[in-house]
């Protein structure tokens, strides 16, 4: 299994891994309830940089400044060119792990796999 969040927050930046701190504690509790071994899963984020104020919208840019060829993330917001390598990293992690299930957690994670919401 692979679990894909959006971006690291304060605790994740300090620890250097996704889903630690308060959100990670809840995540671990839910995994335990479902009898899922976290160590057997890929746990990652769409991007490995922290968004200002932990607000994904603050990582995004206008269409004029967007990476060419990528769909809108949300209304009027696009991925900047400097974050495109993050999508490549995410793809490589997923390919290497070859999970039978990918759980996207958050709208940005859904976008990374499926594009903008219909």
Model feature map: region roles:
Residues 1-118:
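A polyanion-binding, active-site-adjacent surface
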């Amino acid at each position: 299994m692979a679990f894909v969040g959006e971006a690291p927050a304060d605790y994740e930046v300090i620890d250097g891994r996704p889903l630690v701190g308060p959100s990670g504690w809840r995540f671990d509790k839910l995994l335990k309830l479902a009898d899922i071994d976290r160590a057997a899963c890929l746990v990652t984020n769409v991007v490995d940089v922290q968004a200002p104020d932990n607000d994904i919208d603050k990582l995004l840019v206008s269409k004029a400044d967007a990476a060419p060829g990528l769909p809108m993330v949300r209304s009027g917001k696009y991925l900047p060119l400097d974050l495109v390598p993050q999508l490549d990293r995410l793809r490589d992690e997923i390919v290497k792990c070859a999970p039978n299930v990918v759980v996207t957690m958050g709208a940005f994670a859904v976008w990374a796999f499926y594009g903008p919401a219909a």
